[in-house]
């Protein structure tokens, strides 16, 4: 419906529904970060005092959260008895969404992303007025870990079959001693997935966020691939020329203040004719009002996370989360890439894959 055709009651009803969703996402943040979902899933049903004792939290807060979770339909409860005697359980479906880090349905990290935004709201108001931005580092571990954990199950279960379906790319990645570059590697799960999919390859992940590099290094060590995966805290502009057989940029180009400079540096770091694969949001080809659910969500991330991060460095093109295919094509051409295509990878979450060469 066109915005001008809505009544005040319709707008108010929509906002009320959105408010419910907002507070429920924030309650997920509490349950995730305080270990309440994890305890119910791993240790079984509990009363409020029992859950509080298990997790080192306060019983009265635990009770309020448990009641709220039952009211919104995420937990089940045996209603007999006094408030502190009620026993709450987490259904398997809720447990999967909130605690199973390997499931494609794992969405608890989304709550963490907006938990990170809360403390930054005064700063966001300031930069909206006077300019500048709020960097990834300023958003802290909630944002950093949210991004890594939300993407992890997709990389672990879907990346290998997706890449193997692109025959020419798969052949390149399968070469003996192939050298792969992962730009903006974050928590490292994309690099780890590449190493597992192509055991003959050596993967170098780079990121300008030092804490992400530390986290990625620990993840690679725990995954048993540290002998073939290296993470470096550096800018792409310092990469050696002609070293890599393929490069990847997973959900990071839209965050870059100077994407053309980075893409040009990556092109130089690639062997002649080697491909760069970019995974970014599968937004619409062009802007239009009354967008779909994906477009609405991505503009939300852009307002509070990605655009402020991109504008935290100067100069900046200020791309934002909603990077249209034509925008990436223009960046690639300006960086010296002469070929651009959308890869036929379907059903991969919120993302679209591009190949530049």
Q: Regions from the language model: what does each represent?
A:
Residues 57-68:
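Short amphipathic alpha-helical interaction segments
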